Structure formats: C-alpha cells, structure tokens
Amino acid sequence: MYQIFPTPRHFTVTDELVPAGLPVVCLEPALLDACRAAGYDPQANLAEFLTLPGFGLSVTANLMDGVSGAFEMEIRQDGVHISCTDGAGLYYAVEAIRQLAVQTPGGYLPICTVQDAPALEVRGIMLDIGRDKIPQMQTLYTLIDLFGRMRINHLQLYMEGFCFDYPQYRYLFSDETPLTAEEFRSLSAYARARFIDLVPNQNVLGHMEKWLERPQFRHLAECEDGYIFNNL
C-alpha cells in the first residue's frame, strides 16, 4: 500500500505503472519565474530519483488558484500533470513523486491522483544550535532537506552562547566553532530553494551566560557575582 507523508487530503492509486525515466519538464512561464526566484530547479530535483534509462517522463505544471503550497497531480500513461498555486506547491508535488518512486520497484511510478493543500499557513520548527552543540553545515543541509519534505516552511535556528561569529569579538571565543555570516547566507539560500524561511533566533541577555561570564561584559549581568541560594 502506497503512503505519502504528510498524508494528502485526497489520494487514489491504481495497480497500473508507468516507466519513470529522466524527466522532461515543461512549466507555465509564471511558475518558472517563481521557481527561479526561489532558486528551485524542478528538473534537477526530479532527476535525483527518476533515472530509468530509455524512458523520458513528461512532467507538465501550471498555476491554479488556492492557498500557498497547494497542488493537484495526476500520474498517467502520458506523463505527470501538475496544477499548483506556486513554486512551493510544485516542490511538494515533486517530493510526493519522490516518495512514490521509492515505494515502486524497477524505476516505475503508479498511476494515481494526489490533491493536497496545507491546513496551516506557517508550519514551523525551531532547532537549538546553542550551548556547545553547533551542527556541522552538512548536518544542517540534510535537516533542511528533511524539513522541506515534511513541508515545514519556517525554520528558526535558536542561538545561545557563542553560536554566531561576530568578527569584532572573535578573541572571546577562539576555541568555539560558531557559524559565520556567509554560512548563514548559504543556509538561507538553501532553505529558500526548498520554500523554507530561515529565521535566526538570537537571544539577549537573559540567555547569554557565556557572554556575561567574560569580564568585558560582566557589568551587563543582573547579578555580576552570580546567585547563591541558601536554606534549600
């Protein structure tokens, strides 16, 4: 039995299969412009998993009315036909195709129809990268891929301590591995191509223990010498 995650609003599938080779993608011009603006390449996205030699798969997509991220898709013998509200809807349709391809042996796709639309406009997740657990860039890229396939469209990176590389203060965290501004820009572009808004979440003094421990900033602490609890 085929499954698509998140579960779409409507999904009907048959026992018939269609060969799924390297895709030939044709987009409505306005939809193509939207994908280019986001840095999303549906042709390359499909080519990651549609690789059956000798069978080109026609994929056509056009715009329809509706909420952001909505799509309607038919997989037929003559190819894949997608209607979507925007680039995000096309991306979600393509990722649904990925899931169907993984579940179908031999490089085929099932003949089916899928219709879906987000129930929530903002579908967010917050990832804590503070307190001595800053991920490597490849880990963050992998997580962004996963979040995109889950149709997360808002990602906050929670930062506490020395998570961000402030050039003027590098002498304070020479032994740390903070993310640089350039790395954040790369992550933002990578997320945008998966229709995710990347939102850095920088805490202020209430959660800046590592900064306030330094003599240069101790005067900003509410209690410069720390707290002592008696009679506990």
Regions found by a protein language model. Name each.
Residues 120-232:
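Substrate-binding cleft of carbohydrate-active enzyme catalytic domains
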